[in-house]
């Protein structure tokens, strides 16, 4: 038997249901009226802290034989020149993976293999991280390999062409064709940061990558991989000799780089919707907005708490996960983030470290849903976000989330690499002992203080939306019309679920009918 939640068509029934919807459950006080919408203004760039050149972060411990090294450069895709999008990421890849003056790329891999050593590079909007791990027995040889990638890169033309081809393939086939979830997230960046250096894909655009030359890469390396942009992280069995060796070798980098990019104010994207059209069986949904709030803001911890309640990445405790996946079977999972999130794959379900950003974003991600349920699922996410403004969490729910975070935040610092990353992030944000302070803040939060922060920072009116779907015109029409979005289930649902559905079906989506744009995914990130 199919269960269908519909909007009543008879006026009397509609009025009756509306009255019921406003009656609180027996014994509970009525919820306060919704707060007035928060101002949806622009977000200026407040500069990050700048550590001194080649600042050392040392976390020595004698109970491990593994040495961890982390070199974080204050450079990222914001440093890509106009028309050469992808230059920073390709430069970092070619230096880290393309061999050194002494060793070809293949020989570099052969040298690392018997050491069981790790060497990898990651580029984001403002930060590029070169990290390494090795047993202390192999440290002297590894240090030479590790630092030579920066000091004596091979810049092999064949490796340049190989890595550029990989980067082009990642845009044309990976981003556009194979990964609707990432496509939606990159689309959200493009929408909420339109006209800003954050807007383009970190890996580059098709035309940007095609325009690059090996000489571009060589010149860019001298401009941005410099001492004045570098923080050095060392952990494990670290002694004074290792610290001296690292700083001495890395002093071979250029002392000063290009001037920092002056980031502009981010214009509000409230109410905008971008639909990326492509052949696909499902609809991926991302929503969010740029926020002036970042680590160090008094509201950051309570807002992070609220969004953890809504849904930590891949955690079953989240409201969205339980309401949209478990109770309604809409998709695989639904999550919310207080700052930009990229999963640290291979190290749990946590956010990567060293994604420091001057202008952060808040986002909600719905894993792909059946197209017929896309608007309902989107409304559901907005409904449960708005509910946190309208009513505080119950004491039982509040204590559950607080207990979860007291333990879960310790997993964010369970490896030397993650501890180094957290410490380096704190330099830029000015938030020493960040996770300890978060756990201390949890002790003094209340349901009311969290609700107050949500009202100040998480107005649904600020949201912009991105969808990846095939029937773009049909979805656009639904978004523009604002009409209710009934849902049909394959199996019966409890009355309490259907009662909430009646509210979700009519939940206002803050989408402006004149700001719905359709873009073919086949041309996304072309230039």
Model-derived regions: residue spans:
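Bacterial N-terminal signal peptides that target proteins for export
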Residues: 1-10
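C-terminal motif of bacterial Sec signal peptides marking the signal peptidase cleavage site
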Residues: 17-19
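Acidic/histidine-enriched segments that form metal/cofactor-coordinating
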Residues: 21-34, 109-220, 265, 270, ...
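An aromatic/glycine/proline-enriched structural segment found at the starts
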Residues: 24-39, 194, 226-227, 231-294, ...
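Histidine-acidic residue clusters that define the catalytic metal-binding segment
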Residues: 30-47, 189-230, 257-265, 293, ...
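Buried hydrophobic packing residues in well-ordered domains
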Residues: 53, 71, 89-91, 112, ...
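M16/MPP (pitrilysin/insulinase) zinc-metallopeptidase core fold and M16-derived inactive scaffolds
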Residues: 70-133, 199-203, 314-346
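Short acidic/His-enriched helical or mixed secondary-structure segments at domain edges of catalytic enzymes
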Residues: 166-187, 269-282, 327-331, 335-348, ...
